[in-house]
């Protein structure tokens, strides 16, 4: 394997990417891009303390942690409705237009996910079915801090709206003055969020999981956040539903020799600029392309506004992997099970059947991951850290629940009741059996 470097304006040499031959460097590759699913014990203790404090002391604890971690002394945790309307009115009209276009695209996609209740008549006239019911209340967590993410507002709100959730609350961290990003507020207005709170961190998760004197308890909490938010969601699961435990962003690009090196480089950068822990990986059978992307990344990273973040992410978690053929590239991608997978190949639809594990697949060189992040329609809240093997993107299904319906008449229980009672006898559950036989005796 060989690292690439770029020279900053201060002449510091910083590693950008490493190149691996999969046949020879497999173990080193997975050490480079492997992710731990464990949380730091100190973070776990801190989150546990925060959750317990909020559960016991409610608003007072939330306000104390908000002052401690966000530097804000709040008189109200909820953003006034007039602030939300003002943010939309004062926003760049072009920004509002693209928010509205994206919102309609996301709604349109999620409408295809809607499940209907069903009923059918079984043997002997028994009526069976399943009723689909939306949850009453949802809380959407929208990250703040290093960047503002109005796209996360739309992506979390749309499936909840389509599902028919009664009340959709949103929370996002404020700054030290108590202000919330106007872009996020404008997006909340477009999405028709019920109300917005200016809270962040584990204390926000706890407040909506348990409820406080002024904050409602919800049924589900969705949305990404930092490690404190992720661990808080994990710990409150059971008190509420959650979407997933989100980790740092990831992209894998599978490319053949015809792929555009600049497209690939910028797509790797796009994921890396999120966070120093983000992962960007190119897998290709073309050594020529691998070297071209490697060299272009080294040449371009220093000119990027978030170049230091990109360089750190690529150095710590990035890789270029040279494989024997495109089929092996697909197998390696499935081993990673990435959040985002781009297929920069001549015939992506022919390759799709070879892919089993990815949160979202982007077909061809012009279907860049950025399109999915903001505009296309499928949800950008995706499984990370290899969990695409068993988790799915955020969807309408996350905001509904299913109830089984069973209807037997007297005549129908008389026809099969003794067999059912006998089944219960074999499990040693006398009351189960006698509950049926009591009905048989009534005749």
Curated annotation (Swiss-Prot):
It is an enzyme of class 1 (oxidoreductase). Its EC number is 1.1.1.23. The active site is at 339 (proton acceptor), 340 (proton acceptor). It catalyses: L-histidinol + 2 NAD(+) + H2O = L-histidine + 2 NADH + 3 H(+). Zn(2+) binds at residues 271, 274, 373, 432. NCBIfam families: hisD. This is Histidinol dehydrogenase. The lineage of its organism: Bacteria, Pseudomonadati, Chlorobiota, Chlorobiia, Chlorobiales.
């Amino acid at each position: 394997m060989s690292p690439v470097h770029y020279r900053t304006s201060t002449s510091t040499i910083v590693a950008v990417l490493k190149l691996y031959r999969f046949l020879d460097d497999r173990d080193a590759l997975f050490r480079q891009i492997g992710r731990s699913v464990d949380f730091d014990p100190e973070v776990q203790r801190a989150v546990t303390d925060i959750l317990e404090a909020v559960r016991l002391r409610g608003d007072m604890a939330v306000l104390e942690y908000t002052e401690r971690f966000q530097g804000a002394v709040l008189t109200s945790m909820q953003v006034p409705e007039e602030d939300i309307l003002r943010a939309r009115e004062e926003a760049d009209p072009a920004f509002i237009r693209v928010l509205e276009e994206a919102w309609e695209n996301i709604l349109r996609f999620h409408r295809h996910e809607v499940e209907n209740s069903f009923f059918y008549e079984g043997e002997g006239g028994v009526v069976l079915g399943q009723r689909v019911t939306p949850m009453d209340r949802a809380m959407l967590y929208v990250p703040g801090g290093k960047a503002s993410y109005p796209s996360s507002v739309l992506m979390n709100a749309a499936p909840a709206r389509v599902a028919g959730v009664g009340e959709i609350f949103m929370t996002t961290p404020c700054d030290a003055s108590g202000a919330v990003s106007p872009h996020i507020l404008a997006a909340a207005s477009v999405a028709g969020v019920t109300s917005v709170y200016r809270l962040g961190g584990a204390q926000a998760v706890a407040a909506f999981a348990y409820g406080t004197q002024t904050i409602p308890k919800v049924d589900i909490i969705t949305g990404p956040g930092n490690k404190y938010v992720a661990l808080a969601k994990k710990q409150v699961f059971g008190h509420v539903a959650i979407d997933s435990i989100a980790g740092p962003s990831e992209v894998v690009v599978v490319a053949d020799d015809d792929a555009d090196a600049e497209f690939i480089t910028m797509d790797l950068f796009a994921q890396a600029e999120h966070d120093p822990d983000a992962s960007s990986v190119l897998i290709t059978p073309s050594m020529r392309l691998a070297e071209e992307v490697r060299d272009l990344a080294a040449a371009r990273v220093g000119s990027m506004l978030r170049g230091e973040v990109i360089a750190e992410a690529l150095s710590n978690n990035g890789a270029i992997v040279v494989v024997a053929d495109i089929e092996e590239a697909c197998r390696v991608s499935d081993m990673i099970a990435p959040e985002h997978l781009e297929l920069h190949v001549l015939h992506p639809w022919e390759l799709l059947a070879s892919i089993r594990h990815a949160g979202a697949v982007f077909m061809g060189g012009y279907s860049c991951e950025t399109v999915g992040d903001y505009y296309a329609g499928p949800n950008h809240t995706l499984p990370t850290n290899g969990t695409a093997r068993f988790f799915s993107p955020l969807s309408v299904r996350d905001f509904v629940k299913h109830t089984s319906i069973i209807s037997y008449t007297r005549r129908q229980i008389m026809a099969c009741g003794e067999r059912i009672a006998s089944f219960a006898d074999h499990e040693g559950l006398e009351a189960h059996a006698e509950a049926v036989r009591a009905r048989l005796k009534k005749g």
